[in-house]
């Protein structure tokens, strides 16, 4: 069940974008890198089942290795993740996966479930679309970091592989980078002397 319209998603993504930037130290200001990431993202987005011009790619200025997407086509990778990628195909694999989440509207599904929990089915019948977006924004800016279901991750992988292939990248790069992220997460956990708390992309 998705309670948000396409316009609600764009509005919500724009609202949360400002919160994301503040939380992660802002956008990375190395224009050459941000232009490069945007170029790779647009190359992939041209093959997605979603208007390519609605995607917005941002490199966040943090060494944390992570990537995620917001409703409305907002996609984020950290400079730590870009540094970990060994080649363009691995970076493309991450971006393609996040584009898959946007195309399948997984964030909108997650926000809708949260709204159902918070407001109750009876109240939802009287809520307008614009009110829905406003209420969801008030739930806080942490929903985007919560994990997707296994089925959603599988769907994002499937779509991502499709976009990688159509754009001329090696689809195997997605799996190789996932393995690299796992190794990095285990190493960081050992340095901290605790369990691995790294969020999966």
State each model region's role.
Residues 1-201:
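A Zn2+-metalloprotease active-site environment signal
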């Amino acid at each position: 069940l998705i309670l948000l319209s396409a316009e609600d998603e764009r509005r919500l993504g724009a609202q949360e974008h400002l919160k994301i930037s503040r939380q992660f130290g802002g956008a990375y200001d190395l224009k050459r890198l941000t232009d490069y990431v945007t170029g790779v993202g647009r190359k992939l987005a041209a093959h997605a089942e979603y208007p390519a011009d609605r995607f917005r790619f941002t490199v966040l200025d943090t060494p944390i290795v992570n990537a995620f997407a917001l409703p409305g086509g907002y996609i984020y990778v950290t400079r730590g993740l870009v540094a970990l990628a060994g080649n363009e195909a691995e970076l493309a694999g991450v971006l393609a996966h996040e584009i898959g989440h946007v195309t399948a509207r997984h964030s909108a599904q997650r926000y809708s479930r949260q709204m159902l929990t918070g407001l109750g089915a009876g109240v939802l019948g009287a809520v307008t679309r614009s009110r829905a977006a406003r209420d969801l924004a008030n739930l806080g800016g942490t929903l985007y970091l919560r994990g997707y279901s296994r089925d959603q991750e599988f769907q994002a992988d499937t779509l991502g592989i499709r976009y990688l292939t159509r754009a001329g990248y090696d689809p195997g790069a997605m799996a190789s980078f996932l393995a690299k992220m796992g190794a990095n997460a285990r190493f960081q956990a050992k340095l901290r002397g605790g369990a691995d708390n790294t969020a999966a992309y």
